Amino acid sequence: MSRLTIYADSTPDAPLLRTEDPERIAQELSSIGVRFERWSSAVTPSPDDDEATILAAYRPYLNALMGETGAGTADVIRLRPDTPNLPALRQKFLSEHTHTEDEVRFFVHGSGNFILHVDDRVYDAHCTQGDLISVPTGIKHWFDAGETPFVTALRVFTDTTGWVAHYTGDPIADHFPAA
Protein backbone atom coordinates (compact mmCIF):
# COMPACT_ATOMS: atom_id res chain seq x y z
CA MET A 1 0.00 0.00 0.00
CA SER A 2 1.22 3.49 -0.85
CA ARG A 3 2.27 5.62 2.10
CA LEU A 4 3.57 9.11 2.80
CA THR A 5 5.52 10.03 5.91
CA ILE A 6 6.57 13.64 6.50
CA TYR A 7 9.29 14.73 8.93
CA ALA A 8 11.01 17.92 9.97
CA ASP A 9 14.48 17.55 8.47
CA SER A 10 16.00 17.79 11.96
CA THR A 11 13.90 15.01 13.56
CA PRO A 12 14.04 11.69 11.67
CA ASP A 13 12.52 9.87 14.67
CA ALA A 14 9.36 12.01 14.91
CA PRO A 15 6.99 11.88 11.93
CA LEU A 16 4.74 14.91 11.51
CA LEU A 17 2.32 12.99 9.28
CA ARG A 18 1.88 9.40 8.17
CA THR A 19 -0.92 8.49 5.75
CA GLU A 20 -1.89 5.67 3.40
CA ASP A 21 -4.78 7.63 1.86
CA PRO A 22 -3.92 8.12 -1.85
CA GLU A 23 -5.87 11.38 -2.03
CA ARG A 24 -4.05 12.81 0.98
CA ILE A 25 -0.71 11.61 -0.42
CA ALA A 26 -1.46 13.38 -3.72
CA GLN A 27 -2.56 16.54 -1.89
CA GLU A 28 0.52 16.73 0.34
CA LEU A 29 2.94 16.03 -2.51
CA SER A 30 1.14 18.48 -4.80
CA SER A 31 1.84 21.22 -2.24
CA ILE A 32 5.56 20.85 -3.07
CA GLY A 33 5.02 20.45 -6.83
CA VAL A 34 5.26 16.64 -6.92
CA ARG A 35 2.68 14.72 -8.96
CA PHE A 36 1.31 11.49 -7.46
CA GLU A 37 -1.40 9.35 -9.05
CA ARG A 38 -2.73 5.82 -8.89
CA TRP A 39 -3.12 4.21 -12.32
CA SER A 40 -5.31 1.21 -12.92
CA SER A 41 -4.69 -0.90 -15.98
CA ALA A 42 -6.74 -3.69 -17.48
CA VAL A 43 -3.46 -5.49 -18.12
CA THR A 44 -0.69 -6.13 -15.62
CA PRO A 45 2.36 -7.67 -17.23
CA SER A 46 4.28 -10.43 -15.50
CA PRO A 47 7.39 -9.39 -13.56
CA ASP A 48 9.37 -11.54 -16.00
CA ASP A 49 7.98 -9.97 -19.20
CA ASP A 50 10.49 -8.26 -21.43
CA GLU A 51 10.78 -4.48 -21.73
CA ALA A 52 8.83 -4.30 -25.01
CA THR A 53 5.85 -6.19 -23.52
CA ILE A 54 5.77 -3.95 -20.44
CA LEU A 55 6.03 -0.77 -22.51
CA ALA A 56 3.26 -1.99 -24.84
CA ALA A 57 0.94 -2.77 -21.90
CA TYR A 58 1.18 0.84 -20.70
CA ARG A 59 1.54 2.54 -24.10
CA PRO A 60 -1.77 4.51 -23.87
CA TYR A 61 -0.73 5.93 -20.48
CA LEU A 62 2.81 6.59 -21.67
CA ASN A 63 1.65 8.39 -24.81
CA ALA A 64 -0.56 10.70 -22.76
CA LEU A 65 2.14 11.28 -20.16
CA MET A 66 4.85 11.90 -22.73
CA GLY A 67 2.56 14.34 -24.54
CA GLU A 68 1.97 16.25 -21.29
CA THR A 69 5.61 16.38 -20.25
CA GLY A 70 7.33 16.65 -23.62
CA ALA A 71 9.25 13.48 -22.79
CA GLY A 72 11.07 11.84 -25.65
CA THR A 73 11.75 8.35 -24.39
CA ALA A 74 10.66 5.71 -21.90
CA ASP A 75 12.29 2.56 -20.61
CA VAL A 76 11.93 -0.11 -17.95
CA ILE A 77 14.19 -0.46 -14.92
CA ARG A 78 14.28 -3.60 -12.80
CA LEU A 79 15.98 -3.94 -9.44
CA ARG A 80 16.21 -7.45 -8.01
CA PRO A 81 18.54 -9.06 -5.45
CA ASP A 82 20.48 -10.57 -8.39
CA THR A 83 20.88 -7.27 -10.29
CA PRO A 84 24.54 -6.95 -11.33
CA ASN A 85 26.47 -4.41 -9.24
CA LEU A 86 23.43 -3.89 -7.01
CA PRO A 87 25.31 -2.37 -4.02
CA ALA A 88 26.98 0.28 -6.21
CA LEU A 89 23.77 0.96 -8.12
CA ARG A 90 21.79 1.26 -4.89
CA GLN A 91 24.34 3.70 -3.46
CA LYS A 92 23.94 5.96 -6.51
CA PHE A 93 20.23 6.23 -5.76
CA LEU A 94 20.66 6.57 -1.96
CA SER A 95 22.69 9.78 -2.06
CA GLU A 96 20.77 13.06 -2.15
CA HIS A 97 20.70 14.45 -5.69
CA THR A 98 18.74 16.52 -8.19
CA HIS A 99 18.06 16.28 -11.91
CA THR A 100 17.80 18.81 -14.72
CA GLU A 101 14.50 17.27 -15.81
CA ASP A 102 11.48 15.86 -14.00
CA GLU A 103 12.01 12.34 -12.66
CA VAL A 104 8.90 10.42 -13.72
CA ARG A 105 8.36 6.84 -12.54
CA PHE A 106 5.47 4.40 -12.73
CA PHE A 107 5.65 1.31 -10.52
CA VAL A 108 4.67 -1.79 -12.52
CA HIS A 109 5.65 -4.27 -9.77
CA GLY A 110 7.12 -4.06 -6.30
CA SER A 111 7.81 -0.93 -4.33
CA GLY A 112 10.35 1.73 -3.47
CA ASN A 113 10.67 5.00 -1.59
CA PHE A 114 11.19 8.40 -3.16
CA ILE A 115 12.44 10.54 -0.30
CA LEU A 116 12.23 14.27 -1.01
CA HIS A 117 14.03 17.06 0.86
CA VAL A 118 12.16 20.33 0.41
CA ASP A 119 12.93 23.35 2.60
CA ASP A 120 12.93 22.04 6.19
CA ARG A 121 10.84 18.92 5.50
CA VAL A 122 11.52 15.36 4.36
CA TYR A 123 8.71 13.61 2.46
CA ASP A 124 9.07 9.82 2.29
CA ALA A 125 6.76 8.57 -0.47
CA HIS A 126 6.53 4.77 -0.39
CA CYS A 127 5.34 3.92 -3.90
CA THR A 128 3.83 0.57 -4.87
CA GLN A 129 2.42 -1.17 -7.93
CA GLY A 130 0.14 1.24 -9.80
CA ASP A 131 1.73 4.46 -8.47
CA LEU A 132 2.95 7.27 -10.69
CA ILE A 133 5.28 9.86 -9.17
CA SER A 134 6.83 12.84 -10.92
CA VAL A 135 9.54 14.71 -9.03
CA PRO A 136 10.13 18.16 -10.57
CA THR A 137 13.46 19.42 -11.83
CA GLY A 138 15.72 20.57 -9.02
CA ILE A 139 13.97 18.92 -6.06
CA LYS A 140 16.53 17.26 -3.79
CA HIS A 141 15.73 13.59 -3.28
CA TRP A 142 16.99 10.02 -3.07
CA PHE A 143 15.48 6.61 -3.80
CA ASP A 144 15.54 3.41 -1.77
CA ALA A 145 14.13 0.05 -2.88
CA GLY A 146 15.74 -1.74 0.07
CA GLU A 147 18.68 -4.10 0.40
CA THR A 148 16.77 -6.90 -1.36
CA PRO A 149 14.80 -4.92 -3.93
CA PHE A 150 11.99 -6.20 -6.09
CA VAL A 151 10.80 -3.39 -8.31
CA THR A 152 9.93 -2.92 -11.95
CA ALA A 153 9.23 0.65 -13.02
CA LEU A 154 8.69 2.66 -16.15
CA ARG A 155 10.99 5.64 -16.49
CA VAL A 156 10.12 8.60 -18.70
CA PHE A 157 12.82 10.99 -19.91
CA THR A 158 12.91 14.26 -21.81
CA ASP A 159 16.67 13.97 -22.29
CA THR A 160 17.42 10.85 -24.30
CA THR A 161 20.70 10.33 -22.41
CA GLY A 162 18.60 9.01 -19.51
CA TRP A 163 19.19 9.20 -15.76
CA VAL A 164 21.80 11.80 -14.78
CA ALA A 165 22.16 12.75 -11.11
CA HIS A 166 23.66 15.93 -9.69
CA TYR A 167 24.71 15.05 -6.15
CA THR A 168 24.32 17.68 -3.42
CA GLY A 169 26.94 16.27 -1.03
CA ASP A 170 24.47 16.64 1.86
CA PRO A 171 24.55 13.51 4.11
CA ILE A 172 20.88 13.92 5.10
CA ALA A 173 19.93 10.64 3.40
CA ASP A 174 22.02 8.80 6.00
CA HIS A 175 19.65 10.05 8.71
CA PHE A 176 16.39 9.19 6.96
CA PRO A 177 16.22 5.52 6.00
CA ALA A 178 13.09 4.61 4.07
CA ALA A 179 10.03 4.35 6.33
Curated annotation (Swiss-Prot):
Cofactor: Fe(2+); Ni(2+)
GO MF entries: acireductone dioxygenase (Ni2+-requiring) activity; acireductone dioxygenase [iron(II)-requiring] activity; iron ion binding; nickel cation binding
GO biological process: L-methionine salvage from methylthioadenosine; L-methionine salvage from S-adenosylmethionine
SUPFAM superfamilies: RmlC-like cupins
Enzyme Commission number(s): 1.13.11.54, 1.13.11.53
Amino-acid positions noted as binding Ni(2+) in the UniProt annotation, renumbered to this chain: 97, 99, 103, 141
Record's signal peptide: none
Pathway this chain belongs to: Amino-acid biosynthesis; L-methionine biosynthesis via salvage pathway; L-methionine from S-methyl-5-thio-alpha-D-ribose 1-phosphate: step 5/6
Assembly, per entry: Monomer.
PANTHER family named in the record: ACIREDUCTONE DIOXYGENASE
Function comment: Catalyzes 2 different reactions between oxygen and the acireductone 1,2-dihydroxy-3-keto-5-methylthiopentene (DHK-MTPene) depending upon the metal bound in the active site. Fe-containing acireductone dioxygenase (Fe-ARD) produces formate and 2-keto-4-methylthiobutyrate (KMTB), the alpha-ketoacid precursor of methionine in the methionine recycle pathway. Ni-containing acireductone dioxygenase (Ni-ARD) produces methylthiopropionate, carbon monoxide and formate, and does not lie on the methionine recycle pathway.
Protein name: Acireductone dioxygenase
Species assigned in the record: Granulibacter bethesdensis (strain ATCC BAA-1260 / CGDNIH1)
